[in-house]
Regions:
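Short beta-strand/loop segment at the start of cytosolic alpha/beta domains
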Residues: 1-15
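Amphipathic alpha-helical interaction surfaces in cytosolic regulatory modules
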Residues: 19-96
Length: 96
């Protein structure tokens, strides 16, 4: 799992690459927390287009990131959601 960070001054984009399973989620959250603390974004996008796999641990990462951003006055959006990841989100009831 890798995370590529890009901040354009208006939006922080975090691109997740690889597999987001239990072990990767434990590594990802501190990186995400550090980025949010450093940039204090009003808007953050999790770009999931680089994920090849995600399980329920990935859902926890998304929900924790959303909670963290709300606490700092920011908002979270997802983009580039692969089909397999979309299915996980659908099963969890997190899509429209």
């Amino acid at each position: 799992m890798r995370i590529i960070t890009h901040d354009d001054g208006r939006c922080l984009t975090l691109r997740l690459l690889g597999e987001l399973d239990h072990a990767a989620a434990q590594e990802a959250m501190p990186c995400i927390e550090d980025a949010v603390e450093e940039y204090l974004p009003r808007r953050c996008v999790l770009d999931l287009s680089g994920l090849s796999f995600m399980d329920s641990s990935g859902i926890a990462v998304i929900l924790k990131t959303d909670r963290l951003l709300r606490q700092t006055g920011g908002a979270l959006a997802l983009c580039g959601v692969p089909r397999q990841v979309r299915r996980v989100l659908d099963v969890a009831g997190l899509t429209n």
